[in-house]
């Protein structure tokens, strides 16, 4: 048995779903800086209003349950989670407790050189609460967020490092985006996590479990775990475990610390029961099968294909799969005949750089795979050098014209052997002294002759062919 303390983490990951309507109303599911513009009577719990289940959100939930290898429920049913808080207009939240859409899942993800097995307790669909805005002398309620559809993934306590946690969260985020289930934008608060943390030694828990609620952003999640791990370690090593309590804490972004909210003794009894306004209904197997067929190739599947079948290295493959649209662009390039390594290099080096500069999506990028092929074909045929190709790439973006407009005789690479050989013979004839010195051991003069050729051709001479001919002619 190890004498070291082991970090144990479980995650409850909430993600806002992509849908025109809210989870249980026809209210618009949108983001606005103006308060209370996306609300409906159902969202604000007006008397006499009844919920209606958003079928699209149920479909999203089923897809994610399948991705997580969960056992998918035969019957869809919803419960009421009862508690009072100003941001909860109904006095309860519609969620799933007794029969989640998916249970007992398992996911394997690579972390460094190992494979991490993540056990999924359940995945369930629920609605979000309203948001409170606190001011000096008052607090206001914004109902825009009330009723926004959320999907919550609950893991078992199976993580032993922040690296494992972030790897899992990033993978799930990418799956949401690949399947068009959510934009999963942490900057907009579309992903929030409750993080459960405690320590083990010799296979036994030695500190009480602490839940850090509602942490937004992967950096904050990592910081919260690291702080809580150190806080509990310090208490254990100084024989102060008795001072630790099972409690709920919140993360303070300003200090990168966690702050106590309530202890187990103050925990809320939510008194879950089946929502009488939403009768349970059967999930048709044919519909579930149709949904599963819509799931595209996921990030790690594509990465494996890119590395094993297309010969890409880990770095390039990892960059390509980060964005589904970039991966789609790459695959279109390969389909139309661009060499996979050439396409990957242009995308990861040139195109991604341009996208980062502008902040645009590759869907809005001017150069299509077909245009990129014009450039790569010109390099392959010797019409353009790599340097000239980059210039054509830049001119294409700047002028919004086809690359072929700039691949002309005026800027084409000189690759005709007879033309180059005649020119090189003339240059050597005019530099006999340098030729003699080169033949007597001053090998660095070879670059001098290359420079003379490039100067005379204004950089258009094929560099490979130039060096080949120079080696032959300098010996004569």
Regions found by a protein language model. Give the residues of each.
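Structural motif
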Residues: 3, 311, 334-343, 383, ...
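Amphipathic alpha-helical segments in well-ordered regions
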Residues: 228, 333, 346, 350-354, ...
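Core structural elements
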Residues: 189-201, 270, 307-331, 340-358, ...
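Short, amphipathic C-terminal "tail helix"
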Residues: 443-476
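M16/insulysin-pitrilysin zinc metalloprotease superfamily fold
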Residues: 336-337, 343, 351-366, 374-379, ...
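Strongly charged, low-complexity linkers/loops
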Residues: 362-373, 377, 386-455
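Basic, nucleic-acid-interacting segments
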Residues: 1-297, 314, 335-339, 349
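Residue-level detector of well-ordered alpha-helical segments, enriched
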Residues: 316, 329, 339-347, 371, ...
């Amino acid at each position: 048995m190890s004498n070291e303390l082991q970090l144990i983490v479980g995650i409850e990951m909430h993600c806002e779903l992509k849908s025109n309507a809210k989870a249980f109303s026809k209210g618009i599911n949108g983001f606005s800086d103006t308060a209370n513009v996306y609300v409906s009577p159902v969202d604000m719990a007006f008397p006499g209003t009844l919920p209606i289940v958003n079928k699209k959100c149920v479909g999203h939930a089923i897809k994610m349950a399948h991705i997580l290898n969960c056992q998918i429920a035969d019957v869809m049913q919803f419960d009421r989670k009862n508690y009072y808080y100003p941001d909860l207009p109904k006095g309860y939240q519609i969620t799933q407790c007794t029969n989640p859409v998916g249970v007992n899942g398992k996911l394997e993800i690579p972390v460094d050189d190992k494979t991490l097995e993540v056990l999924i307790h359940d995945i369930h669909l629920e609605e979000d609460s309203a948001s409170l805005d606190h001011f000096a002398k008052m607090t206001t309620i914004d109902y825009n967020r009330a009723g926004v559809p959320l999907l919550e993934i609950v893991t078992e306590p199976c993580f032993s490092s922040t690296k494992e946690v972030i790897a899992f969260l990033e993978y799930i985020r990418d799956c949401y985006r690949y399947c068009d289930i959510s934009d999963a934008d942490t900057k907009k608060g579309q992903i929030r996590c409750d993080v459960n943390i405690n320590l083990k030694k010799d296979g036994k828990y030695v500190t009480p479990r602490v839940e850090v609620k509602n942490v937004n952003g992967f950096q904050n999640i990592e910081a919260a775990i690291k702080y809580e791990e150190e806080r509990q370690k310090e208490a254990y090593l100084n024989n102060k475990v008795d001072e630790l309590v099972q409690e709920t804490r919140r993360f303070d972004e300003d200090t990168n610390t966690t702050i106590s909210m309530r202890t187990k003794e103050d925990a809320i009894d939510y008194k879950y029961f089946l929502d009488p306004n939403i009768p349970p209904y059967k999930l048709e197997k044919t519909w579930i099968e149709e949904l599963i067929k819509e799931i595209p190739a996921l990030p790690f599947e594509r990465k494996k294909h890119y590395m094993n079948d297309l010969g890409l290295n880990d770095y390039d493959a990892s960059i390509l799969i980060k964005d589904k649209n970039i991966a789609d662009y790459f695959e279109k390039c390969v389909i139309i005949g661009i060499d996979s390594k050439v396409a990957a290099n242009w995308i990861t080096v040139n195109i991604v750089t341009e996208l980062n500069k502008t902040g645009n999506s590759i869907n809005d990028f001017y150069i299509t795979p077909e245009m990129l092929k014009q450039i790569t074909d010109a390099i392959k045929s010797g019409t353009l050098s790599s340097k000239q190709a980059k210039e054509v790439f830049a001119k294409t973006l700047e002028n919004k014209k086809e690359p072929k407009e700039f691949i002309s005789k005026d800027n084409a690479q000189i690759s005709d052997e007879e033309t180059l050989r005649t020119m090189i013979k003339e240059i050597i004839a005019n530099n006999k002294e340098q030729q003699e010195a080169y033949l007597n051991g001053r090998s660095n003069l070879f670059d001098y002759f290359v420079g003379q050729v490039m100067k005379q051709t204004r950089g258009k001479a094929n560099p490979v062919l130039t060096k080949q001919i120079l080696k032959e002619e300098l010996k004569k």
